[in-house]
Regions:
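Regulatory and interdomain segments flanking nucleotide-handling catalytic cores
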Residues: 1-277
Length: 277
């Protein structure tokens, strides 16, 4: 009885739940909020994400497992850290530290909510909006399952070819994508496998989407296509809401026999070739 009364006693939710994820955990104070260890770790790790080196430690950083935390450090400070594993991001050089190399699409130009103001021209004219793009590859699952089956009576349907195919897709969306974004005012939130999610000034998001699609057609020799949705939002719109609504535009593009783009509304859905020309 006493346990039930204790669990159901009154009080603010922040006294019992993390104010960010609402999990019931042991809470700590961070920036005037009561948060769990995971959310505090995400707060701190978000400041370290720009570093090129990431290490696994036992008790400092973002918790990722039993006695394992992920922490971002600068290369010159590696010698000051006690770690069990090192990861290097987007770097081909072997260097002097034994590390696992990982590649991610992580181009970043400005803070996300600055992009709306950057959409205006040099005279301060134009609509103050940011844009979000979500896109993915059409029928990629079918390509993996049956892409080689019609050639040579299926003799090319091998694990090695599927692995090469997968590696080539990852190379495009994790490495080359940063080059397509490098001169544009946008941030890549996620890029990997066959999905892309990016936020930026609306002019540059459109240009980025078109450039990405054109290069993808070249990369796949015209055998695969993309479908994309681009949403237009005020700068105070929550990212979760922008992602959801843009995902609906992406689905509208796929519903247009794919290889299409939905621009700002499902009413404006076009085949990519028609949109570009």
């Amino acid at each position: 009885y006493q346990t039930l009364m204790l669990l159901n006693r009154g009080g603010k939710s922040s006294e019992r739940e993390c104010e960010i994820c609402h999990s019931v955990e042991n809470l700590v104070s961070y920036h005037d909020q009561k948060v769990c260890d995971i959310c505090r770790g995400l707060y701190q790790f978000s400041k370290e994400i720009a570093h090129d080196h990431f290490i696994i430690t036992e008790n400092e950083g973002l918790p990722i497992g039993p006695n394992a935390c992920l922490k971002g450090v600068a290369f010159e400070k590696l010698s000051q850290e006690a770690f069990s594993r090192v990861y290097v991001k987007n770097d081909y050089k072997a260097g002097t530290v034994k590390a696992t190399h990982v590649f991610v699409g992580d181009y970043h130009c400005y803070e996300i909510y600055n992009y709306a103001a950057l959409s205006k021209n040099e005279n301060g004219l134009g609509i103050k909006r940011l844009a979000v793009v979500r896109l993915d590859v059409d029928d990629l699952g079918a390509a993996f399952m049956a892409g080689f089956s019609q050639q040579g009576n299926g003799q090319y349907s091998t694990l090695s070819r599927s692995a090469t195919f997968s590696r080539s897709m990852s190379l495009f969306f994790k490495v080359y994508i940063n080059q397509f974004a490098s001169d544009k005012k946008l941030s890549i939130i996620y890029a990997g496998g066959d999905d892309v999610f990016a936020i930026g000034s609306w002019q540059d998001i459109i240009a980025f989407t078109v450039e990405l699609r054109e290069n993808f057609i070249k990369w796949t020799n015209g055998k695969l296509t993309l479908s994309a949705g681009i949403g237009l939002f005020a700068d105070k719109t929550p990212i979760r809401l922008m992602a959801h609504q843009t995902g609906e535009l992406e689905e509208a593009a796929k519903g247009n026999e794919k290889d299409s783009i939905s621009l700002f509304s499902s009413d404006y859905t076009f085949k990519f070739d028609r949109f570009i020309t």
